[in-house]
Amino acid sequence: MLTDIEISRQASLQPIESIATAFGILPHELSPYGRTKAKVDLAITNRIKDNKHGKLVIVTAVTPTPFGEGKTVTSIGLTQGLQAIGKKSCACIRQPSMGPVFGIKGGAAGGGLAQVVPMEDLNLHLTGDIHAVTSAHNLAAAAIDARLYHEQRLGCEAFREQSGLAPLDIDPEKILWRRVVDQNERSLRTITVGLGEVNGPVHQGGFDISAASELMAILALSRDLKDLRARIGRIVLAQNKQGDYISAEDLGVAGAMTAIMSQAISPTLMQTLSGAPCLIHAGPFANIAHGNSSIIADDIALRLADIVVTEGGFGSDMGFEKFCNIKTRQSGNAPDAAVLVVTVKALKSHNPDAGSEMDKLAAGYANLSWHISNVAKYGLPLVVAINRFAEDTQEELEWLKARVLQEGVFACEVCEAFTQGAEGAMALARAVVRATEQPSQFRYLYETKQSIEAKLLTIAEAGYGANGISLSDTAKAQLAQLQRQGFDKLALCIAKTPMSVSHDPKLKGAPQGFELPIAELKLNAGAGFITALVGKVMTMPGLGIRPGYLNIDIDERGEITGLA
């Protein structure tokens, strides 16, 4: 079979204007970036606001292996399958970060015959939204250090007289806003800023990957430009020497940050290999952020399509949980059904020494059972999609499907979208249509009015199967500060490893009885949630020993090779 990029390059693509017209987007609501992608103007929302509201399907997965289990392949394949059975469908996915593209995981355009194309456009830059997030974020970092430098250089009163601004009295030891870059770069996790006599007071800093920026979460959760501006103004950047929070509005940088992101607020329209529309917007990671594409993209798609397919990053303990408890709270768009993607290889990875291949599959089934139970907590009709790989045997697939159906899920189908495209996902599509016609009893896992500790305990015990939580001294102090400043009624975003339903990547299957260690609590006032860093989670990934960039090149005709 051809590689993903070879398939993408050989595809017969429609002009993006044709995709838009068929989907219901008018010419003046489109700003093309070349022939195959375009920004969708937010003015469309007023025109379509009274259209019938479509059905929303959230795609999630079991605990993944490092290379992923084909959740995006299944999402794109399902969208194509829905189109093939006569449903007007649209996929809403995140913009890939270039960190994983050049690292081990590769791109996030799907794969095989279930791709968003051109895949190289999607995986490299797209329409520049991540660059806008990065620039706006780092402007705030520069503004903090500049203010700190000038106030310390002049003294508060002289600064007030010369600048006409009120001193902020920033505590250099309590700057909360790190810098970001869209790369995996472990050497930047901890840095020293301000070295040299004229470069400002020396203090510790660091870089996160751009997908971890609060601005990325804000982009994904904003309803319009006005909301984006207000949220950016609420971002907490630092504390003053009295312990009070300093916001982007206080620093006077919120307007400029929003101006940088003014084009990024519009989603990008692309197409799948079968010509189905796909809206790409925002790219927060699910392990260190909330892991879902934008509310704006969903809102547009739901007023134009019969069924909208979106996905949450990693397993159901990660992006799906945050979709339900963070995104849905803010959007008001409750899902109508869920699809849980599983692979034979993922289940085998939980017990690789169990004996025969069937023994490994049976031993690893506990992980799938855990995720089925987890989705059930939210009251959604569930379809399990077995994403077939070439090495899967018929015996394994039949055993797995029969076992899944014993769990009481709505349906279970084998998906072969990777090798067959729309045709390989039609059975899944029909099952999903039937699932969306069932009554949904969607519910949240916790109420935001609970205390921070109570919410943490609920997520740990009901969400992960833990036996309680522990808070570090740092987390305890931060919790007290959040309560004191009135931020204790926000939703929670757990940042943890995606390789286990626990905090420990070595705990495979369906671990129980562990204590969830809360290392740090970080306020994301603009995004509207508190991030709890659990265990040893990193907000800046590193490159592996054989990174993906080693395979990537470009020839004299401008054709990229080796992009996965």
Curated annotation (Swiss-Prot):
Coiled-coil segments on the chain, per record: none
PROSITE patterns associated with the record: FTHFS_1
Binding site for ATP: T65, P66, F67, G68, E69, G70, K71, T72
Associated pathway: One-carbon metabolism; tetrahydrofolate interconversion
CDD domains in alphabetical order: FTHFS
Any Pfam family matching the protein: FTHFS
Keywords: ATP-binding, Ligase, Nucleotide-binding, One-carbon metabolism
Enzyme Commission code(s) on record: 6.3.4.3
GO BP annotations, alphabetical order: tetrahydrofolate interconversion
Top-level class of the enzyme under EC nomenclature: ligase
GO molecular function: ATP binding; formate-tetrahydrofolate ligase activity
Protein name: Formate--tetrahydrofolate ligase
Family assignment from sequence similarity: Belongs to the formate--tetrahydrofolate ligase family.
Gene3D superfamilies referenced in this protein's UniProt entry, alphabetically: Domain 2, N(10)-formyltetrahydrofolate synthetase (3.30.1510.10), Formyltetrahydrofolate synthetase, domain 3 (3.10.410.10), P-loop containing nucleotide triphosphate hydrolases (3.40.50.300)
Catalytic activity: (6S)-5,6,7,8-tetrahydrofolate + formate + ATP = (6R)-10-formyltetrahydrofolate + ADP + phosphate
